[in-house]
Amino acid sequence: MPVIARVAVQAAPRAIDKVYDYLLPQDMAAQVGCRVLVPFGRGNRTSEGIILTRTPGEKMPGLKPLLSVLDRGPVLDGDGIALALWLRQRYFCTLFEAVKTILPAG
């Protein structure tokens, strides 16, 4: 059964800021809280993102696969993700901007 990763994407502007679904390839070990590279938009330009959740699901046509994982382990835990969601609502920023404020530098 395919695994769907819900990702906050850096390239998403405020007007369409939401969580995007991507197919997690079977040979890719990506955990919640890991930074990833994803194809985004009609031109499939590569953008950084962070996995917020993983769920088993049905294979949907048109669902793009993750390109690669940037981290060996999660850089953000459940509390960090919850904080990013709160920051997004409170300070009118994109979800990825909120995530970037809590990630360690480097």
Predicted feature locations:
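Accessory, non-ATPase domains that flank or precede helicase/AAA+ motor cores in DNA-metabolism machines
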Residues: 1-106
